[in-house]
Amino acid sequence: MKRPLIITALVLAFLGIFLYNAFDEVTPEEIENAPDWLSIEEAMIKAEEDGRLVIIDIFEVGCQFCRAMNRDVYPAPSTRAVIDRDFHPVKINGNSEETLTFQGVEMTQQEFANSLGLTAFPFTVIMDHNGTVIDSRRGYMGVQDLTQFMRNARDKASGLSDNSSG
């Protein structure tokens, strides 16, 4: 009678230790040279003031490609140079029930991500100060791919604003 109880207790203890270590590895860590991530509310206010675009990194806690972009791509000097010059960076947890306010509407981060067309993680969205999506892309992007994606979106947005003003 005691033997199954001891075995069950040992299995649960090992499972607890395993889960603790697994979640410890996926929790956010301080990354040197990481962008100064803003909330969507802050980014939209700043974009309205200075005309820069908003880049939104939609991630999932357990996503290894999301972690790789966070650790290796966003802090890269060439990526940071483009972000710092032309963008306000935002991070959204695509599975979070935490609320945010976008264009006066309160919703969960998950609802916001889905409203942007989320199909897979990571999902990167670039929008203007009005909340108009300029471009989006799903999946991992390396440094060159992300910087080119941002430059293309910036050029596309410049073309849109040139057309609307003339």
Where on the chain are the PLM-derived regions?
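N-terminal targeting signals for export/organelle localization
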Residues: 1-33
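Solvent-exposed coil/turn segments that connect beta secondary-structure elements
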Residues: 61, 88, 94-97, 129-131, ...
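Short, internal strand/loop/helix patches
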Residues: 90, 101-118
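Typically the conserved alpha-helix immediately C-terminal to a functionally engaged Cys/Sec
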Residues: 66-84
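Extracellular/periplasmic catalytic domains that process cell-envelope and extracellular macromolecules
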Residues: 48-49, 81-84, 116-119
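Short active-site neighborhood of thiol/selenol oxidoreductases, capturing the structured segment around
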Residues: 49-64, 89
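A short beta-strand-turn-helix
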Residues: 36-53
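Non-catalytic, surface beta->alpha helical segment in thiol-disulfide oxidoreductase systems
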Residues: 72-74, 114-159
